[in-house]
């Protein structure tokens, strides 16, 4: 990010091992020395895929961890990865944000965390008809449309209506 002192980053949380989420992880973690947190499955996949230097300080987050004065909660998500998750971050004043992308469906635990958050980033990945009629190979279409793929725009919209009805005021779409 523009103006961000990368050396001030103490920890990075990885949701899953797909390259679009961690392509620079190995280099940045080595250069700046921040700690990496993820699920055990993701950490093992990162190491097996040579996406994380063996000497990088890394730890498994099973439920939640406190970093400085922030509490970070891990919530499992359904995605075609080793052990994907999303994260809910809570500040000392109780304000919280949930970042939930790369999931085929909205599981009850993710929905509950979203309903309890002040700010929610939610995946809005594809228009179902455009995807079905698009140029992607059939196996990729099936992967995206599966319950371990990506949340459709329609499914996201239904979740957003629920969140607004529950009182969530700050929402952002993610991809």
Question: Over which residues does each language-model region extend?
Answer:
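Core dinuclear metal-dependent hydrolase active-site scaffold
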Residues: 1-4, 61-119
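Glycine/Thr-rich phosphate-binding loops of Rossmann-like dinucleotide-binding domains
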Residues: 22-23, 46, 107, 130
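Short, surface-exposed connector motifs at secondary-structure boundaries
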Residues: 6-9, 29-32, 93-94, 166-172
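Active-site neighborhood of phospho(di)ester-bond hydrolases with catalytic His/Asp-centered motifs
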Residues: 9-17, 37-40, 98-102, 121-123, ...
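Cap/insert and terminal regions of metallo-dependent hydrolase folds
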Residues: 108-174
């Amino acid at each position: 990010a523009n103006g961000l002192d990368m050396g001030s980053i103490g920890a990075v949380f990885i949701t899953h091992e797909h390259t679009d989420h961690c392509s620079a992880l190995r280099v940045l973690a080595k250069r700046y020395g921040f700690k990496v947190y993820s699920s055990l499955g993701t950490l093992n996949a990162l190491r097996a895929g040579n996406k994380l230097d063996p000497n990088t300080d890394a730890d498994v987050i099973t439920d939640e961890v406190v970093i400085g004065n922030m509490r970070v909660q891990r919530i499992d998500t359904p995605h075609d990865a080793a052990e994907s998750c999303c994260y809910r971050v809570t500040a000392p004043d109780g304000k919280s944000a949930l970042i939930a992308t790369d999931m085929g469906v909205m599981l009850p635990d993710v929905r509950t965390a979203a309903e309890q958050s002040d700010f929610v980033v939610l995946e809005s990945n594809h228009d179902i008809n455009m995807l079905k009629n698009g140029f992607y190979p059939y196996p990729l279409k099936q992967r995206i449309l599966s319950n371990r793929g990506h949340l459709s725009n329609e499914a996201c919209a239904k979740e957003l209506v629920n969140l607004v009805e529950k009182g969530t005021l700050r929402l952002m779409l993610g991809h």
